[in-house]
Amino acid sequence: MNLGFGFAEVLSQNYDVDASSDWQPISEYDYTNDKVKPTISKIWNTTYSCIANLNIMLGNLEKANKAMFQDNEYSLCFGEGLGLRGFLHFELMRLFASSPAMNGNDKGIPYATEYGKNIPVQKSVNETMDFIIADLLKASEYLEHDSLYASKSPYTHTQRRYYYNYYANELVLSRAYLWKGDKENALREFGDFLFSVINAGRLYHLNPDTALELSNRK
């Protein structure tokens, strides 16, 4: 809720918050308010808990016998894990760190790539964004086997639609590049996404000329 239509939306001033609402201090960016601090802690702790579980999954997958998986199950599981890890760190970066445009040398957030008790050393914002993008790029390689992207079967399209899939990862990657200030790669990734959807002939209907214009826009 807080990363979807709650806390983040109130910060963005997308809601007309009543003066008596518990959301009011958030809309005024009063992060030290006693009503706000538990929400902030919950976002931080819950998101890192999800990241810890993803790292447990990825660690077990690395040690697993791939022969026990059917078809492309291993690649999908590993790709989803990497992509979600990058995505969740990206969400935390946007809430708790400076933007690269403001100060790329400021400290980012701890980037956790394995499960354990030790807290990762905080790198700079720019370095942390590099970690995020690296996870998303690696996820793209694994998710190329995603049936939503690779298969022509309508059944598999429906089956994979609500998972973290190839298309979702490409869009998150484009957003990450854009937030970092790398417009060239952001547009390239978004253009690749548009063309892959058009060539697949499903999900969306977009004029190819419009897609070309968007992908070439600076």
What are these regions (language model features)?
Residues N53, D135, Y142, E189-D192:
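Alpha-helical solenoid repeat scaffolds, predominantly canonical TPR units
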Residues M93-P100, S147, W179-G181:
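Short coil/turn linking the two alpha-helices of tandem helical-hairpin repeats
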